[in-house]
Amino acid sequence: KKITALSPFVSFTALVENGNKLKVVQVKGVDKQAEDQVSSLSKFVEGDGWQKFAEEGGLVLGSGIAKALDVKAGDWVSLLISQPNGEDQMAQPNRERVQVTAILRLDGQLDHSYALLALPQAQELMGYREDQITGVELKVDDPFKVQEMDYSMLNDYPQLLYIQNWVAKFGYMYRDIQLIRTVMYIAMVLVIGVACFNIVSTLIMAV
């Protein structure tokens, strides 16, 4: 029940623009080396794009977004981000030209809404200091005991943090899976029971 790795990140919503095409994306600013310690995202980046991302920065774009915008690795797009202070709702969004370094293909919904950006660049776009982040992603040795974890190692973190684990956020999905398994088990028992009853009935009638 211990933390084995952690990765700071900056998360924000932006518009990606290519010509007259726009797409809303959830951008996550990450450090490549730290992200490798807590997730397997690098395995789903096409070609050598993950290494290029580590060396050059840029944007790792979900394959669904790339297809909708008609862009590929090496192309340039514009990121439209609302003003960091959020005081003037009518203010023009910040516009930043970034190069698409790689394409992320998960063959799922995230392909249509997810993008990765280098952490320092994300901090700069959001007007954050170097030690300011949105959150810290943790990897633990036993995911099923996250509610019993000791998070004291985060007490000295330079920024106030609030704990949110997967059980609180997505635990209902796990419980639903368990419920479906139970229902399927009961259904199979009933089907087998009815089949056995029919066989026995047929044999009795034949005798």
Feature names for model-found ranges:
Residues 178-207:
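Hydrophobic alpha-helical transmembrane segments of multi-pass inner-membrane transport and secretion
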Residues 52-55, 139, 204:
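A generic secondary-structure micro-motif detector
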Residues 2-116, 120-131:
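A structural signal for hydrophobic secondary-structure junctions
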